[in-house]
């Protein structure tokens, strides 16, 4: 274990730890995917272990499921849970209206299904993920492998009529082969640079034959928790306008690392 966490890991831990404070005994939770969400799973496991917190977790990817089980969190399927109290997940970008780009970890389909089956979605992120306009991060689109090149052409044609600055579309690879999602689909990354109007773009993409889902999360996120490299953390709620500022005890992060043997 490093003597000190990097500023980026400090920020991710701070956001994750504050978000896990929102979890109550008996909740059914959506467990996100990605490096920040992995911190959340670790923090949740700490509460389960130390407080006897009883929760059920619905993971949004195979790797999140494996981590949650390894740390002692009860894992169930969404069909078993049926509906969730809260989902906590990361984001690749978010704007002032809490519109998101997600899918950098190729789990966007399960992430969106789980988030929309929840009473509340809380996004955890470091401060660098907040942007004035979405689009600097490539927008992932999950597509069926059959005819994916035709689907790509249809996406490129659709982008011609959209308020975006870039229109390059690339197939995401794993080594020399197409990356496969948990559902055995492909990911096309849309390099748009700036998205002027996310909502019509999201609707248009999902009308294209061969598109399974896109990484724009519109009207899904309720709360954003932002961590900073010095341990400060802010919580912002969209509907209530609530804004809280605080800080996190970083010794707890080091304890989590030590307990996990990292």
UniProtKB/Swiss-Prot annotation:
Alphabetical GO biological process terms: D-ribose metabolic process; pentose-phosphate shunt, non-oxidative branch
Alphabetized GO MF terms: ribose-5-phosphate isomerase activity
Superkingdom to which the source organism belongs: Bacteria
Enzyme class, broadest EC rank: isomerase
Matches recorded under InterPro entries: NagB/RpiA_transferase-like (IPR037171), Ribose5P_isomerase_typA_subgr (IPR020672), Ribose5P_isomerase_type_A (IPR004788)
Family listed: Belongs to the ribose 5-phosphate isomerase family.
Classification via PANTHER family: RIBOSE-5-PHOSPHATE ISOMERASE
Protein name: Ribose-5-phosphate isomerase A
Annotated source species: Cereibacter sphaeroides (strain ATCC 17023 / DSM 158 / JCM 6121 / CCUG 31486 / LMG 2827 / NBRC 12203 / NCIMB 8253 / ATH 2.4.1.) (Rhodobacter sphaeroides)
